[in-house]
Regions:
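Extracellular or exported targeting regions of proteins
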Residues: 2-3
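Extracellular/luminal regions of secreted and cell-surface proteins that mediate adhesion/ECM remodeling
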Residues: 8-297
Length: 297
């Protein structure tokens, strides 16, 4: 069969006509085989969206079989606020083929911490075991009020030589399928659950929490709060890189860690209290300009 990108999308995405079609092989399978695959897919989705149990299920094992593959998109939606703070959005996504499933269970001696465990599944979606991967912590700040996994991603501002300049204080995250990133990867879940923080991250009285990043989906955070955004005060004008790193302490088990990091080049200019940023283009995508908050001051 031949599939094609329609004209208006070719124009919008600047795709050449010669590159806008592709031939794919279509296999017609017997109903019995198709039903088996559908049952396995549904079983995997049920496993992902089931509420977290109050205790560990299964046995501790060394990871085997399919694993998730965490990757970082280049930082985006970059702007300067109040002439001083470099805001950005960051997305870490799972290229699969396995979902990332992390359960947290409340500690008895510290009510603000949960012990976190990553679950592993075979190709049919059946759980085969788990392994400890750190902790979750209760974040009672306004705008949060949910459980954060503490070793999911990290953000840094690096100089032109990619040496550390500023480190974001945002170190803990609630995992949720906030964005569809690439549903063409093998075993992508086209209809993920837990797509917002309210359904994924538990409450203050939760005994257990299940946080999931499905195959093909990403978790996006906007860094605009002081301490999470980068403070440009005292920094020289020039070239910098916004670093986004997935699984920074490598506590999570995944198929590869070689693709965890991304770097977005930015150029800082202006004077103290009136800084500006120019963002380097990535690939063929042209981002719409973002008005710096300081422009109205």
């Amino acid at each position: 069969a031949t599939i094609a990108v329609t004209g208006k999308y070719r124009t919008a995405l600047k795709i050449k006509a010669a590159d806008s079609t592709a031939s794919v092989k279509v296999n017609v399978v017997a109903a019995d085989d198709d039903e088996k695959k559908l049952r396995a897919s549904n079983a995997q989705r049920q496993t992902n969206r089931a509420p977290a149990p109050t205790k560990l299920v299964g046995t501790a094992v060394k990871p085997t079989g399919p694993l998730p593959d965490l990757r970082s998109l280049p930082a985006w939606s970059i702007s300067v606020e109040d002439g001083r703070y470099l805001n950005f959005s960051a997305t870490v996504w799972n290229a699969g083929p396995s979902p990332l499933v992390v359960d947290g269970f409340r500690q008895t001696d510290n009510e603000d911490l949960m012990d976190a465990y990553q679950y592993f599944f075979d190709a049919a979606g059946t759980q085969v075991g788990y392994s400890p991967v750190g902790t979750m912590e209760w974040d009672r700040r306004d705008g949060h009020n949910h459980w954060h996994f503490t070793d999911f991603a990290s953000y840094r501002l690096l100089d032109k030589d990619k040496k550390l300049v500023v480190r974001s204080q945002k170190e803990a995250f609630c995992l949720a399928n906030t964005d569809a990133v690439d549903y063409t990867v093998p075993d992508a879940n086209w209809k993920p659950d837990n797509t917002d923080l309210h359904t994924s991250c538990g409450g203050e009285t939760s005994i257990g929490v299940r946080e999931v990043l499905d195959t093909g989906s990403g978790d996006t955070y906007a860094q605009y709060l002081p301490g999470q955004s980068f403070d440009l005060k005292g920094l020289k004008n020039g070239v910098y890189y916004i670093f986004v790193g997935a699984n920074p302490d490598k506590k999570l088990y995944e198929s590869s860690t070689s693709n965890n990091n991304s770097y977005r080049k930015v150029t800082i200019s202006g004077t103290s209290g009136h800084r500006a940023v120019k963002v380097a283009k990535v690939g063929i995508i042209t981002e719409p300009p973002i008005k710096d908050e300081d422009e109205d001051h």
